[in-house]
């Protein structure tokens, strides 16, 4: 094994983890200012060292394991969650991909649906009724919203004519897909909120009824891994939204592409935080009704429109 095979993944993983650490600080600061308070401001200048202090505190704590839990699955679940969250980043161009996959988008969907297993295992291995209910909620919610994500993705890929990220940037050279497919963009964005278990869809962490959800028995290091995975998923989903609908620019200028991509992703991520501060939590039946009775019929109709549009204007997408 050469040194480059170790350095390559590390140069990808370490910046993601640093971004995740400071996203937690940004969230706490934004929520603080929206609630007319300061947020973290003691550790370091303006509280900038808070995520480092939090991370150190969590990882040096003694790992506590309740007596009746399943020890292997209990440790395996957070590790799997973080591994899946990191794997999603491999086909994403920044501006070059870590693995140039032909079916980049399909692999991202497959990996994100595999990440559900870690939540299910965590709830089951904890041997707690609250954790199990939380994990079952998370699984039902994630699997449900993946249906609309898949159909929206299919609609966009029909316009593009291929599964690679590079084709998408070429398709959006003259006009963003946001301008032509804004209903899909709105439904995609709301579905990503549900997919990442964020407010107002954070039913898995319903504090009033489930204490903390599927991670109720976790503390210290394993809890930190779940936390990192959740925020890494938020950033990766927003990156995807940016590539799909708000073209990050041509890949001929790597520096401009990266700056453009990061700026737009930051705006989308701040919107996630703004939504968390503004909206109350959905009821579970409202969450399911929104998907199965509103989003699904609408996305299927729009998918048919995207298919028929190409034929009706006598133009086929660039087939690769």
From Swiss-Prot:
Cited PROSITE patterns: COMPLEX1_ND1_1, COMPLEX1_ND1_2
Presence of the UniProt keyword Oxidoreductase in the record: no
Protein name: NADH-ubiquinone oxidoreductase chain 1
Native source organism of the sequence: Varanus jobiensis
Transmembrane portions of the chain: 3-23, 72-92, 103-123, 147-167, 174-194, 226-246, 255-275, 295-315
PANTHER family recorded: NADH DEHYDROGENASE SUBUNIT 1, NADH-UBIQUINONE OXIDOREDUCTASE CHAIN 1
Lineage of the species this protein comes from: Eukaryota, Metazoa, Chordata, Craniata, Vertebrata
A GO term from the CC aspect: mitochondrial inner membrane
Key words, A-Z: Electron transport, Membrane, Mitochondrion, Mitochondrion inner membrane, NAD, Respiratory chain, Translocase, Transmembrane, Transmembrane helix, Transport, Ubiquinone
Intrachain S-S bonds: none
EC top class named in words: translocase
InterPro entries attached to this UniProt entry: NADH_UbQ_OxRdtase_su1/FPO, NADH_UbQ_OxRdtase_su1_CS
Cellular compartments annotated: Mitochondrion inner membrane
EC identifiers of the protein: 7.1.1.2
Main function: Core subunit of the mitochondrial membrane respiratory chain NADH dehydrogenase (Complex I) that is believed to belong to the minimal assembly required for catalysis. Complex I functions in the transfer of electrons from NADH to the respiratory chain. The immediate electron acceptor for the enzyme is believed to be ubiquinone.
Membrane topology, as annotated: Multi-pass membrane protein
Reactions accelerated catalytically: a ubiquinone + NADH + 5 H(+)(in) = a ubiquinol + NAD(+) + 4 H(+)(out)
Keyword flag Transmembrane helix: yes
Gene, per the UniProt record: MT-ND1
UniProt GO molecular function: NADH dehydrogenase (ubiquinone) activity
BP GO terms, sorted: aerobic respiration
Family (UniProt): Belongs to the complex I subunit 1 family.
């Amino acid at each position: 094994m050469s040194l480059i095979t170790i350095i390559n993944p590390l140069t990808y993983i370490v910046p993601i983890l640093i971004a995740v650490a400071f996203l937690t600080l940004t969230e706490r600061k934004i929520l603080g200012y929206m609630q007319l308070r300061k947020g973290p401001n003691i550790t370091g200048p303006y509280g900038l060292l808070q995520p480092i202090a939090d991370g150190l505190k969590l990882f040096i704590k003694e790992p506590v394991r309740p007596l009746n839990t399943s020890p292997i699955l209990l440790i395996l679940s957070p590790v799997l969650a973080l591994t899946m969250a990191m794997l999603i980043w491999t086909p994403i161009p920044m501006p070059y991909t870590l693995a140039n996959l032909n079916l980049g988008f399909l692999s991202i969907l497959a990996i994100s649906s595999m990440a559900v297993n870690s939540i299910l295992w965590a709830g089951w291995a904890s041997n707690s009724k609250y954790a199990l209910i939380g994990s079952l909620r998370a699984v039902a919610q994630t699997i449900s919203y993946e249906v609309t994500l898949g159909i929206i993705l299919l609609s966009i890929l029909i316009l593009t004519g291929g599964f690679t990220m590079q084709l998408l940037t070429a398709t959006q050279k003259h006009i963003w897909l946001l301008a032509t497919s804004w209903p899909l963009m709105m439904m995609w964005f709301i579905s990503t909120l549900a997919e990442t278990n964020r407010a107002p869809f954070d039913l898995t962490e319903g504090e009033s009824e489930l204490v903390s959800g599927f991670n109720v028995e976790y503390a210290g290091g394993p809890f930190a891994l779940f936390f990192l995975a959740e925020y890494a998923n938020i950033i990766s989903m927003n990156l995807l939204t940016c590539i799909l609908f708000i073209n990050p620019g041509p890949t001929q200028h790597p520096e401009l592409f990266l700056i453009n991509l990061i700026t737009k992703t930051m705006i989308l991520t701040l919107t996630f935080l703004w939504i968390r501060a503004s909206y109350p939590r959905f009821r579970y039946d409202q969450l399911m009704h929104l998907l199965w009775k509103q989003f699904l019929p609408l996305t299927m109709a729009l998918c048919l429109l995207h298919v028929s549009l190409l034929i009706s204007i006598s133009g086929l997408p660039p087939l690769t």
